[in-house]
UniProtKB/Swiss-Prot annotation:
Null mutant phenotype: Does not grow on xanthosine. Slightly increases inosine productivity compared to wild-type (5.6 g/l of inosine versus 4.6 g/l, respectively, from 40 g/l of glucose).
Catalytically driven reaction(s): a purine D-ribonucleoside + phosphate = a purine nucleobase + alpha-D-ribose 1-phosphate
Stated induction or repression of this protein's expression: By xanthosine and to a lesser extent by deoxyinosine. Full expression requires XapR-xanthosine DNA-binding transcriptional activator.
Glycosyltransferase keyword on record: yes
Protein name per its UniProtKB record: Purine nucleoside phosphorylase 2
Subunit details: Hexamer. Dimer of trimers.
Upper lineage: Bacteria, Pseudomonadati, Pseudomonadota, Gammaproteobacteria, Enterobacterales
Organism this protein belongs to: Escherichia coli (strain K12)
Residue numbers binding phosphate: H65, R85, G86, H87, A117, S216
């Protein structure tokens, strides 16, 4: 019987990253979604590595996702930052982000800070709002952990209770209050994409308790919790979901609307980092 071969990509990535940035241990890993890459421009002593040089990292096919890993210091905190992510709809399945997340764990990260652009299911939460995620509903097909378990990273069965860490979320609320803008909390609904949701699907998501909807987040959050990385996640609302507004949905509109919340988003993240520094 042949021996099962698990992915060694995270181990290879560690060796490659260490050649670019030796003796560097990041505390926080960021995933920056559509139109949100500007934060990485503020990283000091930055070193950038193309995903193409990192085995298992998702070479994105989506406009607005740069496809590079940036390492350095932000507000005095050592960080690693993904400018762009992979999505289920790009054809690599639910594990498209798993090697990257496990690389962060091996690098020494304690926390995954996940961002994304999302649609609002709540009429009072419009474009330009920020929503701190407190839980999720997964409508994608399965999870990244389907298949044989890689015991090097986590147990076969694991809990998603407090997957979106409550203490870190409270810290985000404190920062938002100090910065002077509202930070709503909500439940994220994952959607496979790449088509946008139908109005009927949106009504269903509202009924089952969803507040925001998007095409990412859940695969990386599940991968992170499997290897015991804490998670905090914030969605930038770029549109009202289908059926809740007359605006025609498009990716170009998503990128343009992400600009509405960009400065608040940067202030939120920088304030958060100052508090944990």
């Amino acid at each position: 019987m042949s021996q099962v071969q698990f992915s060694h990509n995270p181990l290879f990535c560690i060796d490659i990253i260490k050649t670019y940035k030796p003796d560097f241990t990041p505390r926080v890993a960021f995933i920056l979604g559509s139109g949100l890459g500007a934060l990485a421009d503020q990283i000091e002593n930055a070193v950038a590595i193309s995903y193409e040089k990192l085995p298992g990292f998702p070479v994105s096919t989506v406009h607005g996702h740069a496809g590079e890993l940036v390492l350095g210091h932000l507000q005095g905190v050592p960080v690693v930052c993904m400018k762009g992510r992979g999505h289920f709809y790009e054809g690599r399945g639910m594990t498209i982000m798993t090697d990257a997340i496990r690389t962060f764990k091996l690098l020494g990260c304690e926390l995954l800070f996940c961002t994304n652009a999302a649609g609002s299911l709540r009429p009072e939460v419009g474009a330009g709002s920020l929503v701190a995620l407190k839980d999720h509903i997964n409508t994608m097909p399965g999870t990244p952990m389907v298949g044989l378990n890689d015991d090097r990273f986590g147990e076969r069965f694991f809990s998603l209770a407090n997957a979106y860490d409550a203490e870190y979320r409270a810290l985000l609320q404190k920062v938002a209050k100090e910065e002077g803008f509202p930070l709503t909390e909500g439940v994220f609904v994952s959607y496979p994409g790449p088509n946008f949701e139908t109005a009927a699907e949106i009504r269903m998501m509202q009924i089952i308790g969803g507040d925001v909807v998007g095409m990412s987040v859940v695969p990386e959050v599940i991968s992170a919790r499997h290897c015991d990385l804490k998670v905090v996640a914030v969605s930038a609302i770029t549109n009202m979901a289908e059926g809740l507004s007359d605006v025609k949905l498009s990716h170009a509109q998503t990128l343009a609307a992400a600009e509405l919340s960009k400065q608040n988003f940067i202030n939120l993240i920088c304030g958060f980092l100052r508090k944990i520094a």
